[in-house]
């Protein structure tokens, strides 16, 4: 399994090329490739991120995004959702996953969903779409001590589950 995040190619043009080369090698060897888009505006512009992620998409099997990355990088937003107020429309994200799949032909699209209750309390869940079925996780109420690493934990759990041979459910 080869996993990278959108932070990696944002670190410089040479790093983008190295990332592309690593993806090409992994693809040739039949290694599954996943990417957590993880857009960071301090590292690159929306347009640069969109261009790079589009170029890398031909190698990626599983894409992982959050609601903001889907909109910012891929230009695909869920109806009846407002990230700033924490309002979330789960069914709208099923449509987001389908649109991302249609546009880029990934084998799986995973989306982390965060419904903000307050600055320190969120409901977290995720979805996985495989082109046939969209599965939603249980909703987990989370008291946030530090936001860093939530998406990484989600990606690690998905990869672990796939490597163990667990089915999507």
Model regions: which residues?
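Conserved post-catalytic alpha-helical subdomain immediately downstream of the catalytic base
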Residues: 135-169
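Ribokinase/PfkB-type carbohydrate-kinase core domain
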Residues: 1-134, 140-141, 166-167
């Amino acid at each position: 399994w080869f996993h990278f995040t959108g932070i990696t190619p944002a670190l410089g043009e040479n790093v983008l090329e190295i990332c592309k080369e690593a993806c090409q090698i992994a693809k040739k060897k039949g290694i599954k490739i996943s990417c957590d888009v993880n857009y960071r505006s301090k590292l690159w512009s929306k347009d640069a991120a969109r261009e790079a992620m589009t170029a890398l998409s031909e190698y990626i099997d599983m894409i992982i995004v959050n609601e903001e990355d889907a909109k910012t990088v891929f230009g695909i937003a869920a109806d009846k959702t407002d990230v700033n107020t924490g309002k979330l429309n789960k069914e709208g994200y099923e449509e987001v996953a389908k649109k991302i799949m249609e546009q880029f032909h990934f084998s799986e699209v995973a989306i982390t969903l965060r419904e903000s209750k307050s600055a320190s309390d969120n409901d977290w869940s995720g979805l996985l779409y495989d082109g046939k079925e969209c599965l939603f996780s249980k909703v987990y109420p989370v008291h946030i001590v530090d936001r860093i690493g939530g998406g990484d934990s989600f990606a690690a759990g998905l990869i672990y589950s796939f490597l163990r041979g667990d089915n999507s459910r």
